[in-house]
Amino acid sequence: AHTYRYEAGGVAVFGGIQPQPLPQQADGTLKLDDIAAAIKPDDEHFARTRLLALENTWNGKVLALDYLDAATGLAHARGLATHLD
């Protein structure tokens, strides 16, 4: 997502956020299993996972509403906020 690659590290500099990019599928989605696996445990040795950021459109392609519902549903079930860029 451009929020990771092209924003001059703004999320880290201004927000104190440690982004963790995940591999994207050819259609711009993230595998739900990859999202779930990337959520850090409640352990002082890890940066706390608090947010799922998705990008829509992705290279001009609109992500399917059912995918967005599933991804944000997973995030909310795990206590994460969501951001759609």
What are these regions (language model features)?
Residues 1-5:
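Conserved PLP-anchoring active-site segment centered on the Schiff-base-forming lysine
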Residues 6-18:
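Active-site-proximal loop->helix
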Residues 15-57, 62-70:
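PLP-dependent aminotransferase-class I/II
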Residues 63-85:
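Catalytic PLP-binding core of fold-type I/II PLP enzymes
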